[in-house]
């Protein structure tokens, strides 16, 4: 069926200004034609088109006004999403005068919420969804960009008053999207879907898929600006063990360096970083340290000297190294748009060069918008000059992208190409998913910031960046205890899971809030670790099939209109629905369970509801509203260790939630958790679990993969089994049958199988009779 879904330039807003040469630089000519051009340009200067003032700063535009723009009309679409990063609702809003969505990467400390201002990252990619169709627009431009949105709702009007019944016609709604960029070319991709999954795949063909993360990075991360010294690190690490709380990575902020000189260590505070890392290694944990793009101007700092000697810094208009103030004081900024600079920067992570680093050290890229104190909007001036003589205005939003790229490549190179990197970045662009994780920046310890984190992460997720998270507890300020507990509970069900706080905040380790609250935080973190097999499998699908890990409901239920504007609950993969508690002193939450033919099971109580309705769920402070979708199988770990490294050989459990038809399906992806062997040598296991006609089958989902594993499935829980079985047996691939002891609960219609020993890597069946 032919259907017009998108029109280009229907409002006639196509605009393109070519680069010009400043008239004063032209050779003087006496003819009147040249004189008239000069006069025209002088008039443009008077209008600020060639020279613009921002406070005390003057932005001289070497090539004159160079903006571009184009409008798109989306037919029948009223629900739009994407164009992160904004602390705004998931569904994009109509914009008014001076209220456009701004894409301009900025260091905004304690950013305002429900605001269209630009913050740390930009992805110029918009999705539109309606019943039966999803489309996308990818506006590939790294300069400052504004996006205006205006929806014309559907209207019904009378064609004629003739006859007994007036003829009526309904005009479909239309949404107009106007893209405007300060400079660059018009390079736009239209993604026609028609399904959300199709659009995700089409976009990933252009920008890449989410990098497969090392397993440790899906665990809990403990960070603070700053842990004081090696003894502090040792004490915090021991505190997690003492309180039986798992965690995987300790983080060090800028104070670990010698005067904010990156790739160095403070000799008084961290005199023996290798020994500190060996302590963490003995606990099967990692260390993450910060590395920012500004380099302290210091003739005794080798990184600065080598970069300056090779001309690797961004330049000012006079051709000298651009200088700005950041954490170390006066600094120069590496020009990551230059491939040679990226190659050199990557080499700095080699173990002989980065002294004190080991193979358990990973990286955090911050301040890479780039942040420049005391400059316009606290960033680099637009007329700074990059590689190829391009002005900063042309590529501002991609600066942090290149920084993370060079860092990730450095971590890969130091291992000889064998090990996966982990790099967290604050600034990002389309395609940043290929190099690591992103977080929402300097949030505040308030309930409203917990609440806004959900739509912010959903927007990142559908624009390709699945590995995303928000600082637990809020970076700025001191959260009340209830808020901190609720934030841990929410964060445990979000992709990147890190506690972080500014240097002015009180210490915030999980055991500092009383015994009961420590228990609640411990339970939330342990729930995360128990679900790591499911998380890891979801990231594999994000990596190979472009499917978001954290999904808005409309992605999973694209034909259910009520889901289109929901942002307080979401799906993890296709199996789990999560509704974090984001209000203080809440005693109930209203949870919408979608799908008229679905059945949903409370993850803890096993109570079940039919889909297509809103249910009021009572919540105490220990309640995390999570529901498993009927028809799914979720793999878990039956025991939780001190970190992911302690759990590689521990047993699995399967949570089988039956659909209304009595069937279920699920998957497990497994590899060594750290190397590229899954890619180069096909060293992985991909298993499929299917339940039908009272038989659970474990089979291979991908015959190409081979990975030796002694792990067994120890427990199986079947939800929605309406009749108690007479007996249960296992049937192995060698033809042997074994009876299985079981427990059936009629109240919850659940069947529990314990003390099994079914190898995860081999085919087998469990028969319920």
Swiss-Prot record:
Cleavable signal peptide: none
Biological process annotations from GO: carbohydrate metabolic process; N-glycan processing
Active-site residues per Swiss-Prot or TrEMBL entry: 366, 369, 442
Molecular function terms, GO-annotated: alpha-1,4-glucosidase activity; carbohydrate binding
A Pfam family reported for this protein in Swiss-Prot or TrEMBL: Glyco_hydro_31_3rd
Enzyme class: hydrolase
EC number: 3.2.1.20
Keywords: Glycosidase, Hydrolase
Catalytic activity entry: Hydrolysis of terminal, non-reducing (1->4)-linked alpha-D-glucose residues with release of alpha-D-glucose
Job description of the protein: Has alpha-glucosidase activity.
UniProt family annotation: Belongs to the glycosyl hydrolase 31 family.
Protein name, UniProt field: Neutral alpha-glucosidase C
């Amino acid at each position: 069926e032919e259907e017009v879904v998108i029109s280009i330039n229907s409002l006639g807003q196509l605009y393109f200004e070519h680069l010009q040469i400043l008239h004063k630089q032209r050779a003087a000519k006496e003819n009147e034609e040249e004189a008239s051009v000069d006069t025209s340009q002088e008039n443009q200067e008077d209008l600020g088109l060639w020279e613009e003032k921002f406070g005390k700063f003057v932005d001289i535009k070497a090539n004159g006004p160079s903006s571009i723009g184009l409008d798109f009309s989306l037919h029948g679409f009223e629900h739009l999403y994407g164009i992160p990063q904004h602390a705004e609702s998931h569904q994009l809003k109509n914009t008014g005068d001076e209220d456009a969505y701004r894409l301009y990467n900025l260091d905004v400390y304690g950013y305002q919420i429900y605001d269209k201002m630009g913050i740390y990252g930009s992805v110029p990619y918009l999705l539109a969804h309606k019943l039966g169709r999803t489309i996308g627009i990818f506006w590939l431009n790294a300069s400052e960009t504004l996006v205006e949105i205006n929806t014309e709702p559907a209207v019904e009007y009378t064609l004629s008053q003739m006859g007994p019944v007036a003829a009526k016609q309904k005009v479909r709604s239309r949404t107009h999207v106007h893209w405007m960029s300060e400079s660059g070319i018009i390079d736009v991709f239209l993604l026609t879907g028609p399904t959300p999954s199709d659009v995700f795949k089409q976009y990933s063909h252009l920008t890449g898929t989410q990098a497969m993360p090392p397993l440790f990075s899906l665990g809990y991360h403990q960070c603070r600006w700053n842990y004081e010294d090696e003894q502090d690190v040792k004490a915090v690490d021991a505190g997690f063990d003492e309180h039986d709380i798992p965690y995987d990575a300790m983080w060090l902020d800028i104070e670990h360096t010698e005067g904010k000189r990156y790739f160095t260590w403070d000799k008084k505070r961290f005199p023996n970083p290798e020994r500190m890392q060996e302590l963490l290694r003995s606990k099967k944990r990692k260390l993450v340290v910060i590395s920012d793009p500004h380099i302290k101007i210091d003739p005794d700092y080798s990184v600065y000297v080598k970069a300056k000697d090779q001309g690797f810094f961004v330049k000012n208009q006079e051709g000298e190294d651009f200088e700005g103030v950041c954490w170390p004081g006066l600094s120069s900024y590496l020009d990551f748009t230059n491939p040679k600079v990226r190659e050199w920067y990557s080499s700095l992570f080699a173990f002989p060069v980065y002294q004190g680093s080991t193979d358990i050290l990973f990286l955090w890229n911050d301040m890479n918008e780039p942040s420049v104190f005391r400059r316009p909007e606290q960033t680099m001036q637009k007329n700074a000059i990059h590689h190829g003589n391009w002005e900063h205005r042309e590529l501002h939003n991609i600066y942090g992208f290149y920084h993370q790229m060079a860092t990730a490549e450095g971590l890969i190179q130091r291992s000889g190409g064998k090990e996966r990197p982990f790099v967290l970045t604050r600034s990002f662009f389309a395609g940043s998913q290929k190099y690591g994780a992103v977080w929402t920046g300097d949030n505040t310890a308030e309930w409203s910031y917990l609440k806004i984190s959900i739509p912010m992460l959903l927007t990142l997720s559908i624009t390709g960046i699945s590995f995303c998270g928000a600082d637990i507890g809020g970076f700025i300020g001191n959260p009340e205890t209830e808020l901190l507990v609720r934030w841990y509970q929410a964060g445990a069900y979000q992709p990147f899971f890190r506690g972080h706080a500014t240097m002015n905040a009180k210490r915030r380790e999980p055991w500092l809030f009383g015994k009961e609250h420590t228990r609640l935080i411990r339970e939330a973190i342990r729930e995360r670790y128990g679900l790591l097999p499911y998380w890891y499998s979801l990231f594999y699908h994000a990596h190979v099939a472009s499917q978001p890990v954290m999904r808005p409901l409309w992605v999973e239920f694209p034909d259910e209109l009520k889901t289109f504007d929901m942002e307080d609950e979401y799906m993890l993969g296709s199996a789990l629905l999560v509704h974090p508690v984001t209000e203080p002193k809440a005693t109930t939450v209203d949870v919408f369970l979608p799908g008229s033919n679905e059945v949903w099971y409370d993850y803890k109580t096993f109570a079940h509801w039919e889909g297509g309705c809103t249910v009021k769920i009572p919540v105490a402070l220990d309640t995390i509203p999570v529901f498993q979708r009927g028809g799914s199988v979720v793999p878990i770990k039956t025991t939780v260790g001190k970190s992911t490294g302690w759990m590689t050989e521990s047993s699995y459990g399967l949570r089988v939630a039956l659909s209304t038809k009595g069937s279920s399906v699920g998957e497990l992806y497994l590899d060594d958790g750290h190397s590229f062997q899954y890619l180069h040598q096909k060293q992985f296991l991909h298993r499929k679990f299917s339940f039908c006609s009272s038989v659970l089958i474990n089979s291979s989902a991908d015959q190409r993969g081979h990975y030796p594993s002694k792990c067994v499935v120890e427990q199986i829980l079947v939800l929605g089994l309406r009749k108690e079985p007479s007996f249960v047996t296992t049937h192995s691939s060698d033809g042997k049958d074994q009876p299985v002891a079981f427990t059936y609960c009629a109240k919850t219609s659940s069947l529990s199988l314990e003390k099994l020993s079914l190898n995860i890597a081999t085919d087998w069946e469990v028969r319920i009779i």
